[in-house]
Amino acid sequence: MQQKQDIKGFTILELLVVITIVAVVSAVGYPNFMDWRLDREMRASMEKVSSMLRSINTQAQRGNFSIVQFMVKPSSNSTEFISKGMSKSAESTIANTSGQTVTCRIVTSGYWTNQQVEYSNNDVATNIDANGAVCFSKDTRYFLKEGKLSSLLNVSIEGRLTSNYIIICTTENATKSGGKCATNQLDGLEKPAYLVEWNRFGNISKFKWGGSGWSRL
């Protein structure tokens, strides 16, 4: 004779306990997940900027362009990053024309041989609230800055001051600082934030904001 199996389901109380536990775990874990996601987004944008700077400098070193430009074009909710190049013949024409000098001109047409070598649009903010650009050349003869990148405040990195950088932070953080990323803790810079530094030789360095200072990556 087959015995009856004593099979019981969950009681309403047990289900409520399980639901409560899941809710508590979710409430604790969700903020951490959001922080992680934001950090990944900021870091990805920083890596893109770093890659674009290295790439355009490599093209200058190879002689593809005589002068190259990295341009930052911020808007209210995103930032465009654009690299451009000027051919040797175009640079020579400007340099040899009376009354003209080679500059890091910010334009949307003309002047540059290639107006868009590389382009990226990211939902991030930077430490500038209007267009800015930096230009490099193979022989370091040209190391020029234009627009907002020509008048940056010095920031302290590894015990030294530099004005050759771009900071990437969330648009929410930038809103608290007048529409652009702050440059230090006192002015309101918050995590996650990243910084890309360059020099006239085209060397690129990357840093992460730790809450009170910059750490090299």
Label every model-predicted segment.
Residues V28-D35, D39, E47, T58, ...:
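N-terminal helix-rich module
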Residues M1-L38, M42, M52:
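N-terminal single-pass transmembrane signal-anchor helix
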Residues F65-V68:
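G2-box/ATP-lid motif of Bergerat-fold
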